[in-house]
Amino acid sequence: VVLSGCSEDAMDRINKDHGHTQSVAGRFILTDVITSTAFSNAGGDLNTYLSSYIEYEVGVDNQLYYAETRESEPTSSSTFNNTWNNLYSTLKSARIIINQCSDGGIDYGNYTTKGMAEVLAAYNCALIADMFGDAPCSQAALVDENGSPVYLNPKMDKQEDIYKQAMQYLDDAIADLQQEDLIDPSSQDLLYQGDAEKWLKFAYALKARYTMHLLQRSTNKDADMEKVLEYVSKSFKNTEEQAAFSVYDVNNINPLYGFFKARAALGASESMRSKLAEYNDPRLS
């Protein structure tokens, strides 16, 4: 008979994964959050289906044809399933950056990175509110120090409360983006290469957008319109400052072009062409 034993510390180490890192610097997570926000959330199924619903383009084949004819896609639970999952995955990553850059976190002191993540968290929260109305948000996409969900069944939030969360993220971002980082995130920032002033303008642009979204619910529209004008004055001055995800090339194709090339499911919209002609829009030529 052979008996063996080990210390309690050794037993504690057995079930730990030593082959993978347990934490990543926030600036590296930032690259993924920017990419998934632009490519999958703003440029994925929401882009293709909604362009058909509002007649920017016309669905001519496969699922976009069914979206065009309203046969099944608008009400099918699977239509936006991928986007739904990715919105929360992206929001989770943004919140991880925010937590790591907050007091006590491994990236504490990197205020610019934190501000960038707060802008992106606001953007994704607002996408959830715009597309799904009431939805989990305040308790969703939160993880503990071990990466496990804090809430397995997050509560439903009212759409208006999700907007409040988005606006709070933007207010926090505006404060943080006017401070500095201990480590330069420019090489991981695919939007503005670490330019905090442009991120600040992006934050104000979103505040203007979301304030306008809520105007029909406003109790003082005149005051809120003044806020919109104030936010706009602090935002982009030209199209070169806009938050454009300009990384596409022959090896990294735009998701809309990739979808069209693979499936040819979208065509030119007569409704859109007629509207451009009505206003003598130069883009027709």
What are these regions, as identified by a protein language model?
Residues 62-135, 149-164, 168-180:
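Conserved, well-structured interaction surfaces
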Residues 188-240:
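Aromatic- and glycine-enriched pocket-lining scaffold segments that form the walls
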Residues 222-285:
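Hydrophobic-face positions in mid-chain alpha helices that act as interaction patches
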Residues 6-55, 88, 104:
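Membrane-proximal, proline-rich intrinsically disordered regions
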